[in-house]
Amino acid sequence: MAFVLAETPAGYALLKASDKKIHKSSTLIEDLNTLEKVVDQFKVHRFEKFQSAANALEEVNAIIEGKVSENLKKLLEDSKADKKATLIVSEAKLGNAINKLGLNFQVVSDSASLDLHRAIKEYLPELLPGLDQSALNQMSLGLAHSIGRHKLKFSADKVDTMIIQAIALLDDLDKELNTYAMRCKEWYGWHFPELAKMITDSVAYARIILTMGVRSNASEVDLSEILPEEIEEQVKTAAEVSMGTEITENDLENIKALAEQIVDFAAYREQLSNYLSSRMKAIAPNLTAMVGDLVGARFIAHAGSLTSLAKAPASTIQILGAEKALFRALKTKHDTPKYGIIYHASLVGQASGKNKGRIARTLAAKAALSVRYDCFDEERDDSDSFGLDNRGKVESRLSKLEGRDMRTTSKVSRQQGKIDITEARAYNADADAPSAVADADSDDDDSETEEVEVKSDDKKEKKEKKEKKEKKEKKEKKEKKEKKEKKEKSDKKRKRDDDAEESSKLKKDKKSKKSKKD
């Protein structure tokens, strides 16, 4: 007896084959090319209908994962016979799982079984009564959409793909803006070259071109909305004595078109930056509190997803973005890099050169905790309290290393000694007596002698330290010299021994040759 398990969008169909050895005969499978032959060969033994669309999704996911669901197990247990029967399935993983159940089935899953399933699915509506092709197509489409949604696990609040695309677009916009601004300055510079030296902001430069047009209009237009009053006066003065060439209306139209592009791109870039900031606060608020929205977004984009970043250890997060330098260092056996993308975080930027590596390591450890909290804590709200607590710890660590409070711009240490303010003593007229003067002089002399003694003690200490250092250096030089002499002696001795061995060998060879001749 041979059964074929066919999974349909409507339910499980267990078909009984008229030929017991159909899976072994390639000719029989090849002959299943018409409806009559398929209907004659297979009959419906049992059909287990899915209860709902959600149930259908669960059953299909179980098949994909190679698991036997309760419905399928019940169907197979009800269908088992006294004699051992053959069960043909399409999925090898599912076949292994059915074998482990210990039912009275010999499970077969090979290339021939796939051809068999292909023939059955082609004429499935005719094999299953009450199921037409249109209904089957509708069920297949609905189930396919359900599987797609399940795999994507779509959530409007947890889509890190939006962050990845936004940060990539932001980088592209920056490059385009720089290119367009440079081209605009070079183009309009032929007409008004002095303007580029006075206006460094590209957007302000483009807005001036759109407002003013040719430089002769500078005295008539109002640029107070774009520039401060002082710079506006400088621009108008420079326009009157400019050394630039004249341009036509057609030239100006094209330059203005480029300037409009720059202004529009800048406005869109600002909007995109705000969008990215809001997305980061919704998806990874604690990571944003630690490293900022731009650096956090670059972390997620580089790792591929928020989950991948959360699974990464702190050491990986620390050097994320410096993979080329890392592998180059490993290849050449040099020092590995201390930081990657994390170098652009504000906390690392505040640290001095010698402390940057330490702060990068500390920040990476706390950022790893924050991103795991963002990713895996299901009960968390959108607050960034956990990230702010961690940031405070990193800031206190930075303050200890730098010796100053890094939360302020002041570079003066806050641990200064207290200043005692004492009242000035009133003048004592009795102190004018000669004895008092003498006593005062003697006190001054004593203080002077004490100062001299302190200075002499300092000199002695310095002298002793210097002598110790010189003795140590002499000792090291002597040891090096002795080692060198010993090495030279051993090398000479080894050379003499080698020469003696070679001479003895030569003598032996000569003797042996002489004895052979005799």
From Swiss-Prot:
**Ranges annotated as biased composition (Acidic residues):** 440-451
What residue spans carry the Basic residues bias annotation? 462-484, 507-518
**Source lineage:** Eukaryota, Fungi, Dikarya, Ascomycota, Saccharomycotina
What protein am I looking at?
Nucleolar protein 58
What organism does the record attribute this protein to?
Answer: Lodderomyces elongisporus (strain ATCC 11503 / CBS 2605 / JCM 1781 / NBRC 1676 / NRRL YB-4239) (Yeast)
Pfam families in the record:
Nop, NOP5NT
Keywords, sorted A to Z: Nucleus, Ribonucleoprotein, Ribosome biogenesis, rRNA processing
Sum up the protein's function in the record's words: Required for pre-18S rRNA processing. May bind microtubules.
What are the disulfide bonds? none
- The answer to whether keyword Ribonucleoprotein applies is yes
The segments labelled Disordered in the record are: 400-518
Where in or outside the cell?
Nucleus, Nucleolus
